[in-house]
Amino acid sequence: MQMMKKRILLCLLVGMTCLPVLAQFRVEVSGVGLTQLPIAVSAFRGQDSVPQKIAAIVQADLERSGQFRGVDTVGAALDEGTRPDVALWRQKGADSLVTGSVSRLADGRYDVRFRLWDVVRGQDLGGQSYAVTQADLRLSAHRIADFIYEKLTGDKGAFSTRITYVTKAAQRYQLWVADADGENAQSALASPEPIISPAWSPNGSQIAYVSFESRKPVVYTHDVATGKRRLIANFRGSNSAPAWSPDGRTLAVTLSRDGGSQLYAIDAGGGEPRRLAQNSSIDTEPVYAPDGKNIYFVSDRGGAPQIYRMPVTGGGAERVTFTGTYNISPAISPDGRWLAYISRVSGAFKLHVLELASGAVTAITDTTADESPSFAPNSRLIVYATQSQGREALMTATVDGKVKARLAGQNGDIREPGWGPFQKQ
């Protein structure tokens, strides 16, 4: 129990120390998946005259997914209206080819067009066009990557979704909303006191978080569109670890109002909380199962922190993690198949993934200070924070751990990542 308290204190306070904020990230992909589709993304005709290199963003998205391997296009610029020499691209080792163009419209917006080709069969697999502002050029590239990913893998792409993370610079904490690749970050809120545990609402319109501005942890929700916030939990003692129910109507929170850290459910608009379990152990870090029937959480009721599951109505809990003696920070994949968590192994904190149906556990990383895992909405990637080369960094990994991408800046550290849901287009 004492070790768990020390770990929670470390997560809440010491772990928030960061270097200056990152303005941009550099994507570094490492590892090789078992099956990677070779794809060539040619330079879009006209892209040299616009602020964003559309083709480069598309290729980086696809490679970061672990499902694709980029084929060198040697500077070829092909527009979507020209049928490519498919035999040539087969010789280059590509199975698929992306061509496109970008041009300025009379109203100042940009016309972005693309087409996807199966060069093995010589088939046109379709394309789309977008009329976007300069600010949305990157978004158009992410949407192109989404189209390609879904067309070639059958799974929905998550490149046009968003993530959150927290930074600290000069005694100033900030919660950021960024593209899924870490770029295009916008400050959502700032405080001289720590901000922790950001959690997206199921529709992506709100972010629940914990602020220490009252000199103790208090739970708020932040409206992403308007910037308005609502007080959710400011009861006696600690208020922490908010988690949204799948329907967005309820938040599970950890409160110490009745002594010790216990799990409660509270209306998403605030109100009187309802205690979920009656016991004397420390229960914290709740997360809802995608079907809304169960809550996963961390408890020391067995003597050391492990992950448990119980019905949302409360009552008896069953232990879920059995590999390792110290397991925290549960995250459930949106498809309900995987549980990501942090396990202490020989003093190091490492990301693991448990397949819930089989009980098979996979060690994802070889780093030593992983934290805060969060699944992409298509369940194919995990974003997490870790320490690499002496400082904190944001990483993504495939669920098998074979491909990782480091979103690294020249200066600065980032913490507490969270992956948002699919957005309506």
From Swiss-Prot:
Pfam families: PD40 (PF07676), TolB_N (PF04052). The keyword Nucleotide-binding does not apply. One of its GO terms (cellular component) is periplasmic space. SUPFAM superfamilies: TolB, N-terminal domain, Tricorn protease N-terminal domain. It comes from Albidiferax ferrireducens (strain ATCC BAA-621 / DSM 15236 / T118). This is Tol-Pal system protein TolB. It is found in: Periplasm. Part of the Tol-Pal system, which plays a role in outer membrane invagination during cell division and is important for maintaining outer membrane integrity. The Tol-Pal system is composed of five core proteins: the inner membrane proteins TolA, TolQ and TolR, the periplasmic protein TolB and the outer membrane protein Pal. They form a network linking the inner and outer membranes and the peptidoglycan layer.
